Amino acid sequence: MFFMKKIRDKTFTYLLIILISINYLFSQSKIMEYDKSLLTYDFSDPNPIPILSKNPKIYPYFTFDGYDLNSEQKKFKIIELENDYVQVFVMPEVGGKVWGAIEKSTGNEFIYRNEVVKYRNISMRGPWTSGGIEFNFGLIGHHPSTATPVDYVIQENEDGSVSCIVGNIDLPSRTQWRVKINLPKDYAGFFTEAVWYNPTPLHQSYYNWMTAAAPAANDLEFFTPGNAYLEHSGKSNNWPINEGGKNLSKYNQNNFGPSKSYHVVGEFNDFFGGYYKNSGYGYGHWGNYEDIPGQKLWLWSQSRSGGIWEDLLTDTDGQYIEFQAGRLFVQYLPSGDVNPISNVSFEPNSIDIWQESWFPVKEIGGISDASQYGAIYIIRDEDSTTLNLNPFINFNGKIQILLDDKKYLEENVNLQPMDVYKMKFKINEGINFRVKINDLKIDYETINKKLIKRSFSSHTLKIKETNQSLFNSAIQDISYRDFDKAKEKLKKIIEEDPYHTDAISYLGEIHYRNGEYKKAIDIIYSGLSIDTYNPSLNYIAGIIYKEIGDYINSKESLGWASRSIKYRSNALSKIAEISLIEKDYEAAISYSNKSLEYNSNNISSLEVLAISNRLLSNKEDHQKILTKIESIDPIHHILSFEKFLIDPSEINKTKFINSHRSELRNETFLELSIRYFNLDQTKEAQMILMKGPRHLTNDLWISYISNNKDKLDDLVKSNSINFIFPFRRETIKVLEWAKNNISNWKVDYLLALNLWSKGRHDESRKLFKELSDIPENENFYLSRASLMEGSNVASYNDDIKKAY
């Protein structure tokens, strides 16, 4: 209003400036970090037996087998983000989850916050606690870090927003995930920006679902656009009215049968949510359809079988439902159903970035349409229509009602976030009209024109095994980390059709993954003798030659691979890495920049650029690259380490060490070290490990890098094997080196585990058998018994007896 008046008084002008400045100051979002005591039913009893026989897909993680029946107060780190409209709470020590979120004008939770931390045996590793938003990456299930600390940083941004970035490595795939929880200064809701990248040269499993919780209540109605829902198998069913006439979009009509998973599909839309009809508030999620098409509802059974989980997971907060957003249509579990749904792979050296919004609604009756900037609900009567609006931002603009795409009504409104605006107009029920609110990116039409033409059923297909169907099945196995199954299927295909170059390429990749480089190059060479220009075969050949140090043939093969747009950025990045290894830093920079032309966020290329510029003393360019990496991944440990290398002060050393905050810090130190080692930066690789926690695998790497054999025997003798789970293909050569230099059963045992994890079961069994009854450690015998079970009953029984 001040700006509409002519200002003549200087004093008043100064006062106006002060008032605006104060208003600007108070409109900033704020972020706080503090410890909070919460009633906790804790978990304990980590299991030292490798998970390889139980769930090899998540090795090297281990399970927790103890769960408290009684609670105690326990302190947790809380990151609180707040502006004038909402409060958001993050728990970096509990998987980085959003603990809950509150709409301040009503005090209602639009993200369910469980006031107790009640761990129960639900996740892949066991402990899981309900509520908030859980970030799941990697493989179907509650991710392995869901109950343990992850890395995090907090930021106060120039635009007045605040952010908490959480993230971790998914160890089996070695992919890196980050989620930025961002709260703008004048926004009724918050954003999450996910960054997930695959820094490996291999295909990895691809799974992402953001699992949010909301209170369960009989008046809850789900606004989830679509005309079908899919089961985990991909089987299609009717939505929202099922075959029995139940309206599944109403919580109270789900009072039948077991717990439910509804993956709702069929409509090209960007939002879904829920509304409590009697309480007058609700929650919602927004994300571009091309980024986050998956929308799932999880409902506990309303019988006692579901009700017991209210007692098991909460004390006084009541039952909850989950509304989940995913990168795919379905949380897919392979079964006998024939349909178009499948698992997919994460392409080598690729990165995915997407944004989502989580918001409250109040006093509007439901959600007919929503964007990241506002939500509307339409109420139709016989002779009139009511439009209810919640903006999430300051909104000074037009609401347009169109009939036959011609303006019927237009209103100018000036609203603040979470204002409730209602307009009633004369359009009879049954007449189609359109609502356009351009400034809020809302465009809604009462006749649904957003149903998609996509089949979710394959009833017309006859199940017939062909080489192509078997190949598709093998690719599914790779995406589901069933590498042994995939290998056998690919071998069968190649036996029947030696010209199936796709099968040859993937089989070579599996052998590379397993550290079997001779087998890998032999199979790939057979394919290249059929098709010398094949980009996939050349790419796999290139990474194999690079691994065995044949850089000429690696660069030659990668050059051909780079002609394909699929491999261009990745292949050029690998050539840049070889140039760095060969100490041709200018070439490393040149190839990295070429790689970035085709993927500007290629983390591997940016890493090579940072290291090369530092080695050339290009301080300004070095800093620019670190700034670029930080803009993509503020948690990346290379940032603090490279800064330490430039300025090796005590403060920078502490910053580097403290940047590793996750549960398994030894693994994040080792992952960074191996990255430098693979680039022939051996001094830096050793330095990283020396500054990290003491751990047998890491210490063996230190000895290997420095070729220090003198204290190797003492090192191994003085360390326990408990919770030492080597899994990287690079560590195989370290353990083989140690085995060749000392005689100690622990090295053989660790090598056997590493080989088993890579599908090299015969080699692993041989090592286990050769150890006979030499080890004096009960966990060795339990581990051998669990892995060798079924191969020899007498040996299994003997191992169990020795353990106990």
What are the residue ranges of the model-derived segments?
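Alpha-helical repeat scaffolds
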Residues: A520-S526, K555-W560, A587-K594, K619-S631, ...
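Long, contiguous interaction/recruitment modules in multidomain scaffold/adaptor proteins
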Residues: I367-E465, H637-L639, L700-I721, F727
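Acidic, contiguous internal or C-terminal segments within carbohydrate-active enzymes
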Residues: L81-E82, V88-G107, V166-A217, E356
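Extended, loop-rich substrate-binding clefts of extracytoplasmic carbohydrate-active enzymes
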Residues: P48-K74, I78-E82, S130-A188, W309-V344, ...
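TPR-adjacent "capping" and linker segments in tetratricopeptide-repeat scaffold/adaptor proteins
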Residues: K450-F471, F656-R665, L735-S743
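Start-of-helix register in tetratricopeptide repeats
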Residues: Q468, D502, S536, N570, ...
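Canonical tetratricopeptide repeat
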Residues: Y506, I540, K574, V608, ...
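A contiguous, surface-exposed recognition patch within enzymatic or periplasmic domains that forms
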Residues: M32-D42, I79, K97-G100, N108, ...
